[in-house]
């Protein structure tokens, strides 16, 4: 079944996830959707020092938004902050150094953040794909700790902050790779199965889709969404998937093309006309399962994921 899912996904990707797929989809975009200015609104972008995150932060800054960059690497983050200020002319760019794979650090960060700042939009962009099983200092598998638990803790902690503001939104940068994975709650940290970093990443992205749907039902005052940016030429892809990067080459999307739907979901009034909790691709809701792929999960399986995350979030608070 995994072989079928992977083949179907790759064929779909060649049609839709490439640069040519973006160019085709963009013919249906409403050009004025992103002709907005957002002074007075505050945006948090995790992983904002490179790739899609930096492209997103740059465009928000150019439109007058206050941007909070949440990054792990201080030196690279300082460089990104300086570049964004220089190119946008916007001084309201703040830098926060946080390792999202360490939930205690995330809880502490939010506790301090909410004492000084407001927030309208959270963009969960940061992620990692570690190809050999690696544990954090808390003993958690690093991909899961960053991509799933980190997103869960940060979003959960910030929901009360977001609910106080006008037009609050949460956008999570997922991946079309999640289409090859059924939600797995029996071994979420890959302790009992052969480790494949690409499949672990895809599983994390499936978990993000489930979380988005759950949050949307639980918190109707906030517009939640997740999205697939397409196959994008980013530093992360070059580092973690060198073979894939070499194979696709010039067919990969630019960082700006990858960031387009993130920006649309974060900025456009039209985005909140769509139901909360959806998965988006190129500014449109997209299916979360491939035909005949048997990747649907039961409510009990989804509840088990929440229970696992809640227990870990409490343990490391």
Curated annotation (Swiss-Prot):
Residues the entry annotates as binding substrate: 175
Keyword terms, alphabetized: NAD, NADP, Oxidoreductase
Binding, NAD(+): 50, 52, 201, 205, 234
Protein name: Dehydrogenase/reductase SDR family member 12
Enzyme category, top tier: oxidoreductase
Active-site residues, as the UniProt record annotates them: 201
Top-level taxon: Eukaryota
PANTHER family: DEHYDROGENASE/REDUCTASE SDR FAMILY MEMBER 12, DEHYDROGENASE_REDUCTASE SDR FAMILY MEMBER 12
Molecular functions per Gene Ontology: oxidoreductase activity
Designated gene of the protein: DHRS12
The enzyme's E.C. designation: 1.1.-.-
Family label: Belongs to the short-chain dehydrogenases/reductases (SDR) family.
Upper taxonomic lineage: Eukaryota, Metazoa, Chordata, Craniata, Vertebrata
Known function: Putative oxidoreductase.
Species of the source: Bos taurus (Bovine)
Pfam families noted in UniProt: adh_short
């Amino acid at each position: 079944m995994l072989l079928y899912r992977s083949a179907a996904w790759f064929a779909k990707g060649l049609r839709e996830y490439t640069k040519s797929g973006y160019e085709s989809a963009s013919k249906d975009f409403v050009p004025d959707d992103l002709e907005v200015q957002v002074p007075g609104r505050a945006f948090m972008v995790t992983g904002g020092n490179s790739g899609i995150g930096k492209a997103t932060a740059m465009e928000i800054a150019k439109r007058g938004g206050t941007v909070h960059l949440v990054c792990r690497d201080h030196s690279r983050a300082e460089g990104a902050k300086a570049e964004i200020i220089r190119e946008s002319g916007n001084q309201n760019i703040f830098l926060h150094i946080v390792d999202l794979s360490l939930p205690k650090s995330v809880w502490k960060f939010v506790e301090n953040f909410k004492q000084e700042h407001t927030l309208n939009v959270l963009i969960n962009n940061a992620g990692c794909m570690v190809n050999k099983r690696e544990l954090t200092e808390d003993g958690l598998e690093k991909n899961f700790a960053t991509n799933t638990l980190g997103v869960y803790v940060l979003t959960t902690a910030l929901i009360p902050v977001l609910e106080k503001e006008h037009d609050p939104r949460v956008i999570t940068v997922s991946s079309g790779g999640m289409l090859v994975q059924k939600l797995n709650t029996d071994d979420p940290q890959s302790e009992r199965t052969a480790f494949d970093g690409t499949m672990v990443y895809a599983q994390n992205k499936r978990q993000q889709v489930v979380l988005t749907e759950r949050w949307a039902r639980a918190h109707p005052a906030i517009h939640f969404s997740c999205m697939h940016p397409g196959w994008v030429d980013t530093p992360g892809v070059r580092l973690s998937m060198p073979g894939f990067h070499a194979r696709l080459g010039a067919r990969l999307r630019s960082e700006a093309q990858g960031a387009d739907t993130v920006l649309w979901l974060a900025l456009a009034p039209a985005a909140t006309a769509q139901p909360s909790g959806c998965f988006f691709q190129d500014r449109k809701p997209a299916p979360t399962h491939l035909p005949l792929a048997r990747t649907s999960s039961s409510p009990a399986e989804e509840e088990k994921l929440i229970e696992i995350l809640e227990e870990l979030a409490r343990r490391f608070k």
